[in-house]
UniProtKB/Swiss-Prot annotation:
Protein name in UniProt: Palmitoyltransferase ZDHHC3-A
Biological process terms in GO annotation: peptidyl-L-cysteine S-palmitoylation; protein localization to plasma membrane; protein palmitoylation; protein targeting to membrane; regulation of G protein-coupled receptor signaling pathway
Family (UniProt): Belongs to the DHHC palmitoyltransferase family.
Statement: the UniProt record of this protein carries the keyword Transmembrane: yes
Principal EC category: transferase
UniProt modification remark: Autopalmitoylated.
Gene Ontology molecular function, alphabetical: protein homodimerization activity; protein-cysteine S-myristoyltransferase activity; protein-cysteine S-palmitoyltransferase activity; protein-cysteine S-stearoyltransferase activity; S-acyltransferase activity
Gene source species: Danio rerio
Annotated lipid attachment (S-palmitoyl cysteine): C144
Amino acid sequence: MRSPVPRFRDVERQASGLQPPQCLPSCHERQSSMWFIKDACGIVCAIITWFLVFFAEFVVLFVMLIPSKNLTYSLVNGTLFNSLAFLALASHFRAMCTDPGAVPKGNATKEYIESLQLKPGQVVYKCPKCCSIKPDRAHHCSVCKRCIRKMDHHCPWVNNCVGENNQKYFVLFTMYICLISLHSLVMVVFHFLNCFEDDWTKCSTFSPPATVILLILLCFEGLLFLIFTSVMFGTQVHSICTDETGIEKLKREDPTWEKTQCWEGMKSAFGGPLSVTWFSPFTDLSCQKDDSSPVPMFPQGEIIEEDVIEIPLEPH
């Protein structure tokens, strides 16, 4: 359903705790504390994700590479696969434990709204669940129980929302999982071909039936995750390039913001111009300094009751 009243997009760049337009996600806000969602389903899904990666590691190393007679083949593929798997798990951890862009709770006060210096006739929205002023493009997540800036969706596999501050890590996670899935499938095919040409008893330290079962399981896992993560990766890149989140597409919201170009959106999501840091889950998003006067993140005052606040027009 389309929004009947256009939201006020300037709140996002004027409210403290919400970055100005030229500033990427706040550095001190992201690093101040560990972010973790205590959701049973999400925790189980995250554990399953790590288990499946370690299972793939086990099959690749102990079933295919270590028993191989070709040392160069084992070293090259072992180094490549383990490096990609490590980057995938690191990206998963960052996506899971990074604040996706939560709006501070309880800032829907009269004093706070006055400090924003809004223009007459402008409209701001209060989230009745968070008691906070919702910036444009922020949506409330029922699992995280917070309003998230530029929320794309809540992903149980990373036990977190994918939002403004952690979209980079989610994109990297899907990319690296896609790559190790493809790599494992290629190695399984080569291993099967070598085993058919050679003696199965010399092909692996495991028995032939156990080897076949493990390879089939890895093949099934690799194919499943290759399809899933490649679709998710493409969806996320398309979302960044079109400057429209998944939830905005789902709700068919009319854009009240000025859309950015594809390359500018990529630079914003990944923290600057194209460089090797784009592919690293260990680098934080850079933040430019804002010269505007600061506004208190947690202003004092009573929470207003209205969910839609319109700044009154000046009397003539």
